[in-house]
């Protein structure tokens, strides 16, 4: 794509070692595994493609909170933006508790998406272009991109005239709700991560997070894919010095990360596939109980998971990853 830009001196000066970050992680209660073992695992966040977030959740009972705390320390976001440990802990613990106990759209999925997004950014040409604000907004967008998800699709919510669909005028219902919750949580006591941002950075951060989350709406998939393909491959004019282009690139990165498990080892992909199917089937059961038509992929009695996954990989995942 020809996008290249040196990381600012400010970023280089503030980058910390993994050991520094590990000191911050040790504050968490580890019940199953030792601190040293978990610190070693966390050092793979954003680095090891097939990192399994379920290990962290199983060991600590947390996923969002512990990964966020580790990354805020690693990239010195606390120091850069004057964010206290209390605010970091309170916001991300509140965010994690705001996720519902869905089979798929849960806090583990959010943390896994963040890991995958950071892998895309830090293990690619984008690494030399990342600025502290990019890291801050990417972490928040990834961890908040499904907060409050009810385990039901936009179409279901609209068809059943659910309150959230009424509130957001049937348009990207869930994604708008996720954005709103991500920001509204900052209004709670000891939760304002952006309290000391300049007005310019606050506006940039808000726009980035909103756009990144809204673009995870699969009904917008082919529109953003076509737009990105045109800019990246046809015109070859994406410029990371341009803020709107940065937002487009980060939005595409989050889209890819959102379905990133489809390109990981079979064990991980099959685990996530089973979970999303379980969630779909739960919706199908509700539709059956209401005598409504069962949505596509939601009928557990007539499911062909292998066929549906083959189509998903061929028509959605592969074209997306090829452009990215």
Language model features: what each stretch is:
Residues 2-66, 70-77, 104, 119-132, ...:
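Divalent metal-dependent phosphate-bond-processing catalytic cores, especially two-metal-ion Mg2+/Mn2+ enzymes
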Residues 108:
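N-terminal active-site segment of His-dependent metallophosphoesterases
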């Amino acid at each position: 794509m020809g996008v290249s830009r040196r990381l600012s001196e400010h970023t280089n000066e503030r980058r910390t070692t993994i050991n520094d970050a590990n000191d911050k992680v040790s504050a968490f209660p580890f019940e199953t595994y030792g601190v040293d073992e978990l610190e070693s695992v966390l050092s793979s966040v954003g680095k090891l493609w097939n990192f399994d977030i379920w290990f962290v959740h199983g060991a600590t009972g947390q996923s969002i909170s512990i990964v966020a705390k580790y990354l805020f320390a690693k990239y010195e976001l606390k120091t850069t933006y004057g964010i206290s440990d209390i605010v970091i802990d309170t916001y991300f613990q509140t965010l994690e508790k705001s996720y519902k106990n869905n089979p798929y759209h849960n806090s583990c999925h959010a943390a896994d998406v963040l890991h995958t997004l950071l892998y895309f950014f830090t293990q690619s040409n984008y690494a030399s272009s990342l600025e502290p604000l990019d890291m801050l907004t990417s972490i928040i967008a990834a961890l908040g991109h499904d907060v409050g998800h009810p385990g039901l699709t936009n179409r279901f919510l609209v068809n059943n005239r659910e309150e959230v669909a009424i509130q957001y005028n049937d348009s990207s219902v869930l994604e708008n709700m996720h954005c709103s919750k991500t920001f509204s949580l900052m209004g709670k006591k000891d939760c304002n991560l952006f309290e000391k941002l300049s007005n310019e950075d606050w506006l940039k951060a808000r726009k980035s997070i909103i756009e990144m989350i809204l673009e995870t709406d699969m009904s917008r998939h082919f529109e953003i894919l076509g737009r990105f393909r045109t800019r990246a491959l046809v015109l070859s004019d994406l410029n990371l010095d341009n803020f709107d282009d940065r937002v487009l690139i980060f939005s595409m990165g989050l889209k890819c990360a959102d379905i990133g498990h489809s390109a990981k080892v079979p064990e991980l992909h099959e685990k996530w596939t089973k979970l999303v199917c379980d969630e779909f089937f739960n919706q199908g059961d509700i539709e059956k109980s209401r005598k409504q038509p069962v949505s596509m992929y939601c009928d557990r009695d007539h499911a062909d998971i292998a066929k549906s996954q083959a189509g998903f990989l061929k028509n959605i995942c592969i074209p997306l990853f090829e452009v990215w």
